[in-house]
Design a protein with these regions (language model features):
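Class I SAM-dependent methyltransferase SAM/SAH-binding core
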Residues: 54, 60-110
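Conserved alpha-helix/loop element of class I SAM-dependent methyltransferases that forms part
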Residues: 31-49
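Short, glycine-/aromatic-enriched active-site segment of Class I SAM-dependent methyltransferases
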Residues: 155-174
């Protein structure tokens, strides 16, 4: 039977590449809050007690490699971009953990796993790029074991930016919503032990945290690839220039939050 290919958000051919296309091409991943936020999410999801961990939207694979090295568990890493997965596999080989990570191309709204599979699921900077947040969360719950944890790290609007800035937001997350909207979505899930830790962004600290998480070994070559695209690829050149020209004041309207929930245990059969 033919396997249904996940819907891709990545463009091809002569169409101007998107923010995510550029990230995949040069091999870079951005998560709000950097190392500190991601490490806090791992703690909240009790990865030290997990045997099977899923990371959705693994990007270049920093998270899966770190989890595989730090925790005694098996990691499954999925991304909708095969280019991102290629970077992630390369990092796993460099870190010596490729045997402990399974990589799959998949869409967060159509995960190719059976019900009740994972002890913990980590999702960072994924739902900001999709409209179907409720459907994605239902799918995450489906593949989580009863008693397992789901942790999200997603950006939100502290307040919606003015129209002259809002147009730039499509480059950094076309599905960004307000904190109040996020609280409504998370509040009606069937998850237990729901918490939301909201944080404001500080631009300089954000840069430092991202460098600490990704590492100079990945960042410097990535900037070299950005320069190459600027010099050789007209379609990429326009997209990169647009992203580099995003007004810095847009950050003043943004925050990020760590969302935690636990799937209820199944009731004992009577």
């Amino acid at each position: 039977m033919e396997t249904k290919k996940p819907k891709s958000i990545y463009t091809t051919g002569d169409v101007e590449p998107t923010y995510l296309d550029i990230q995949a091409e040069v091999g870079v991943t951005k998560h709000m809050g950097g190392y500190a936020a991601t490490d806090a999410l791992y703690h909240l999801c009790h990865l030290d007690e997990a045997q099977q961990v899923l990371e959705v939207g693994c990007g270049i694979g920093v998270g899966p490699a770190y989890i595989a090295k730090r925790f005694d568990c098996r990691v499954t890493a999925v991304d909708i971009s095969e280019k991102m997965l290629a970077w992630a596999r390369q990092r796993a080989r460099h870190e010596g953990v490729v045997e402990r990570i399974t990589f799959r191309e998949a869409d967060v709204c159509e995960l190719p796993f059976e019900d009740d599979r994972f002890d913990a699921i980590i999702v960072e900077s994924v739902l900001a790029f999709i409209e179907a947040k409720e459907a994605a969360i239902r799918e995450l719950i489906r593949v989580t074991k009863p008693g397992g944890y789901i942790g999200l790290n997603e950006s939100y609007w502290i307040q919606p930016p003015p129209p002259e800035l809002l147009s730039y937001s499509t480059s950094i997350g076309p599905g960004i919503i307000t904190e109040a909207e996020w609280r409504t979505i998370w509040g009606v899930t069937p998850l237990e032990e729901r918490t939301i830790q909201a944080h404001n962004l500080e631009a300089k600290q954000e840069v430092r945290d991202r460098i600490k998480w990704v590492g100079w070994r990945s960042i410097l070559p990535a900037w070299g690839r950005v320069l190459k695209l600027l010099l050789t690829n007209p379609h990429s050149r326009d997209a990169i220039k647009e992203q580099l020209n995003i007004p810095t004041e847009l950050v003043n309207y943004m925050g990020y939050a760590l969302f935690l929930g636990r799937k209820p245990q199944k009731s004992a059969e009577k």
